């Protein structure tokens, strides 16, 4: 495969969800390619059938499409180096492993699970790190052939050099070296004939012409083994970009198993996809130069400015408050029509009576940080909640339950006027304001009680006249009359 352009790949395992760290890897991989007019490849690594979850491939497709991380080659659209599903590439891996055996760079290992367990138990008892002891590393060729002919189970192991060092250069962490003596003879082909994750990764990356490998820093320790495989085959080694972990706090990694949010969870809570992607990009990466102080970036912006030298070595702490702030900014930037379209499903889940959604959204949008918190603000529309008349007391508005009764009685004829257009919020407000002036009172003295009478709450998405126009004349008059009756005791 010619390497005349940058080729990156996102290679997830279909385990059922897209956690934040995975999505960040996908994003950085996409940006690395697109910033350089390169090719972004999607490869599904489904060889670990024990972790495979039905429908998980669709989760991967849907997440990448929703976030705009569209691939140039992949399982559904094909490409010049397919197939792009690892389980469909099984035939080739064993051939490559056997090539290494023939060249003396790998070997058949016949050690049983029982022997390995006993070996590791003994090593642990002596305070040693568990490792393979090379028992089958130098078996005579005749013995190997005899045991293979007898059908004895085996794995194929890489023959790691016992001396020297293996080093590599990472675009984030710099030059790293490991003593070969510290590395185990890793398994390439398992007893069932399936390749190990590491081996399949190297072979597939080579055959697909991958020039830049972007992954989590947990793979730093495996990279020397990857490089020894590239060297054994005489293949070009890709550029490595290892990203710092995403942490829940200083001690704990973000983990779905610990109940931490996946991408789907965040969307289900009402975070906007664009905001999630923006925030995730900033987890361990910082813009440079004129963009250093900027926090809001569209995907198109990121394609223009993203470079790997902005990636930090330090772990990134997932900050829910920062995500909220970025999400709130994205909500504020929506047009009224866009906000209504996004908020409407949440409104409909909470309100089943006719209301003026356009006016409701005009009041919600400046205050809303997360769409999922909209329903709890609307629980009074369908049915008036129980409330205590002490709510009418407000020092700032200079109201008491007694003055509230007076205010509502004064408002009743205003709101009952058939000529008053409840579809025009300003008209209703002006009529109420005129009544306040007539009484020699401030607007709040009249309108604060109206808000309580219509909602039974101090905090609502809009003031009294807003709520009246959202609910309409009939509901407004019913609730004002009920409030007067309640205040009469």
What does each of the following model-derived ranges do?
Residues 34-46, 199-212, 233-247, 460-466, ...:
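Glycine-rich phosphate/pyrophosphate-binding loops
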Residues 426-488:
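Charged substrate- and nucleic-acid-binding regions of tRNA-handling and nucleotidyl-transfer enzymes
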Residues 2-125, 222-235, 275:
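N-terminal Rossmann-like or analogous alpha/beta NTP/dinucleotide-binding catalytic cores
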Residues 102, 107-242, 248-254, 262:
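Active-site cores that bind ATP or allylic diphosphates and position pyrophosphate for catalysis
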Residues 29, 60, 100, 104, ...:
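Residue-level signal for inorganic ion chemistry
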Residues 18-20, 266-274, 313-319, 352-360, ...:
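Structural motif
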Residues 336-439:
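Small-residue-rich helix-loop
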Residues 83-87, 110, 189-190, 208-219, ...:
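Conserved phosphate-binding loops in nucleotide/dinucleotide-binding enzymes
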